[in-house]
Amino acid sequence: MNYTRHTYKAGNQNWNIRQHDNGWIYIANNKGLLEFDGVAWNTYPIRNAKTRALEIGSDNRIYIGGMGQFGYFCPSPLGGLDYTCLSDSLPSTVSVGIIWNILSDKNRICFQSDRRFFCLENGKISQIDVFSDIYSSLVVRNKFYMTSSKGLMILNGTEFIPVDNTSDIGSTVKTGGLLSYQDKLIVVSRDKGLFVYDGSVLRKYATAADDFCSRNQLFCAALK
């Protein structure tokens, strides 16, 4: 089933999609948060900012991020959804940038921007600076991973540290995505195909799509 922007009456770019426990679909769209209940579409703007990232937390809040801000939606007593901006609580000297991804475990929600993470835990927001461009990020079994020009990194306390034997990522391999498969990480490179990290060694993973991958720029991926 395909829906055009004339049907859902919002922007023509959709960046992220999630399905709520109730079956409703939520989408990060240029015009805001799209909601589809199977029959009707609704659009909820975030102060007219373009949205880029979306996640549904264990608390059933719909976390959203975009250009210069992040926050969450929750049901309104009058129907529909109400928006709360979390980034308003940051010091005026802090630049949010663009929120590209939102990660969650049972305790934290982390909003990933260009070079830092803003992590919400117990109602407080902390900031983790990476000091290099972040290419992709992922949570696997409550462990936070990300790739940057420094390689594959894992969150250790309040900082990201390099994962052993993955220095090729970042220095020669730019990533377009991270995927979890069984007990391994699949690294989707921009133009060099797939790599697999098994916990100790990073190796190239040959597929029938290698030629396609080398001739095109990959920016996202999913496992079915």
Task: Report each predicted region and the residues it spans.
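Carboxylate-rich, polar loop motifs that coordinate divalent cations or form catalytic acidic clusters
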Residues: 1-224
